[in-house]
């Protein structure tokens, strides 16, 4: 990984703050997308430290973690293999599991062999995808979601906690980007963006149960990520084709959503995870490949300014 120390923060978007509702994000046809999912992902270790994963434009894979809960970060370390898009989640026993698709769409995963411990080798899953997301269901089993190059949507889950996987099942609809998160009551919620930038979501009607149909959000995005606030409200994050950054949240846990609010700055990739104390942290990559993050300064609260990481990841 080329290491570049960046000291400037992203340019502020004039007149837009954390609490201001703005017009729904629109597509500006400014930047061509890669056709693959996010180049950046985050998950939380058993000991509460966040871990960040990313791939660069050469498909090399890197990760780094907080040195202490909510604290400073380690340096980047390389992982073997080559991936184009990535996702990560924590198993019920605290072991992180890391997923990715390579440039041919083949799907791989590896996992910590003990909580906060060493990593297994790569194992291939059948099928081909271009975008991938993962969440943990109410039973503690990971569920994997993805879209392929034709926009077809699939999912599969662990048969037992930390165990082998079911076969793929197809979900109706067509998406190019996917994100998933678990509601406070254990119901999974799936978010996605289609090739026109339209934004959709659907959710389990009961924990571990059947799914609703697709519901469309206003606005247009090219990337999407999700995390859960300390008070149980899901929050989604995304960027549009002009690299503007937006977010919105459930008004109350499991209820309808706020309007979109715009963050300052410009990103082309996003990922989000919740710190051990309940504060969401947002990670992103801009059009030059530079990596940034910001975090809630208190649970359910306002956001810090952007801070830069060293290194370059795929825009």
Where in this protein do the model-derived segments appear?
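Secretory targeting and sorting signals
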Residues: 1-23
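A structural motif
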Residues: 24-315
């Amino acid at each position: 990984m080329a290491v570049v120390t960046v000291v400037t923060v992203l340019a502020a978007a004039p007149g837009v703050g954390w609490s201001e509702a703005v017009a729904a994000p629109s597509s500006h046809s400014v930047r061509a997308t890669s056709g693959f999912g996010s180049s950046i992902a985050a998950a939380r270790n058993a000991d509460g430290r966040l871990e960040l994963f990313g791939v660069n434009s050469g498909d090399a894979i890197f990760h780094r973690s907080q040195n202490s809960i909510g604290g400073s970060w380690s340096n980047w370390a390389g992982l073997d293999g080559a991936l184009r898009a990535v996702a990560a989640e924590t198993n019920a026993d605290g072991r992180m599991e890391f997923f990715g698709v390579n440039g041919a769409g083949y799907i791989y995963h590896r996992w910590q062999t003990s909580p906060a411990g060493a990593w297994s080798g790569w194992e291939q899953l059948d099928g081909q995808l271009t975008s991938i997301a993962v969440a943990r269901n109410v039973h503690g089993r990971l569920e994997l979601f993805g879209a392929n190059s034709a926009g077809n949507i699939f999912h599969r889950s662990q048969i037992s906690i930390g165990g082998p996987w079911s076969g793929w099942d197809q979900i109706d609809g067509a998406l190019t980007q996917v994100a998933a998160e678990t509601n406070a009551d254990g119901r999974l919620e799936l978010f996605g963006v289609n090739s026109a930038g339209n934004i959709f979501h659907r959710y389990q009607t009961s924990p571990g149960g059947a799914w609703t149909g697709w519901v469309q959000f206003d606005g247009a995005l090219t990337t999407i990520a999700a995390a859960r606030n300390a008070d149980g409200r899901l929050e989604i994050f995304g960027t549009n084709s002009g690299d503007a950054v937006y977010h919105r949240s459930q008004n109350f846990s499991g209820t309808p959503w706020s309007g979109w609010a715009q963050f300052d700055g410009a990103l082309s990739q996003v990922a989000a995870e919740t710190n051990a104390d309940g504060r969401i942290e947002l990670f992103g990559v801009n059009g030059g490949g530079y990596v940034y993050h910001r975090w809630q300064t208190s649970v359910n609260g306002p956001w810090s300014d952007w801070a830069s990481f060293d290194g370059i990841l795929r825009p």
